[in-house]
């Protein structure tokens, strides 16, 4: 049994997964929590994508292919982890890519709608992941916590690249 968790951050496209992953990782670093972020989607994003000027990002970003070799490499790395992992997953995994989730232990779900959360909840349950949080993402509505146990549920706002995120959901 793997002693370290691998928490997939999952949700539909453009729901704020990468921005939330970045801010969660920054918060964990400030708390002195050793961890590593695995970008399990070849979309060319990473911490640099959050920190670099937008014009530079447009020039440098290089989307890769979601090939079987990429999926195999991600699965291998997840299986041999030596630290807790945050796994930034793509928003539209195809069935052959879902094997990545079999290497994970937990899920943090984020979506702009209840339907998006339900879709990803089914995916997480199908792969035996323990759901830690279900977060509704909005650009302008205030943050709120609906429930803190057994699953953190609530709303987070302002998950926009290059903007600071703070609030009770983070």
Mark where each language-model region is.
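Phosphate-binding P-loop
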Residues: 1-4
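Structural motif
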Residues: 8, 84-88, 108-110
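Short beta-strand-centered segment that lines the nucleotide-binding/catalytic pocket of NTP-utilizing
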Residues: 30-48
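Hydrophobic anchor at the start of a short beta-strand
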Residues: 33-35, 85, 131-132
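Conserved NTP-binding/hydrolysis module of P-loop NTPases
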Residues: 49-65
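Switch II (G3) loop of P-loop NTPases
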Residues: 58-62, 77-95
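Conserved catalytic-core segment of NTP-binding enzymes
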Residues: 91-168
């Amino acid at each position: 049994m793997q002693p370290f968790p691998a928490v997939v951050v999952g949700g539909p496209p453009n729901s704020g997964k990468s921005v939330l992953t970045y801010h969660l990782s920054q918060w964990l670093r400030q708390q002195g929590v050793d961890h590593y972020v695995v970008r399990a989607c070849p979309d060319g994003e990473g911490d640099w994508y959050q920190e670099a000027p937008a014009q530079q990002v447009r020039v440098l970003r290089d989307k890769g292919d979601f090939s079987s070799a990429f999926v195999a490499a991600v699965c291998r790395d997840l299986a041999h982890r030596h630290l807790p992992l945050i796994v930034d997953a793509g928003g539209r995994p195809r069935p052959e890519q879902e094997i990545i989730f079999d290497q994970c232990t937990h899920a943090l779900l984020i979506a702009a709608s209840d339907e998006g959360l339900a879709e990803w909840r089914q995916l997480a349950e199908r792969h035996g992941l323990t759901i830690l949080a279900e977060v509704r993402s909005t650009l302008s509505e205030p943050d709120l916590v609906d429930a803190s146990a057994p699953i953190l549920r609530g709303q987070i706002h302002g998950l926009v690249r290059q903007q600071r995120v703070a609030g009770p959901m983070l």
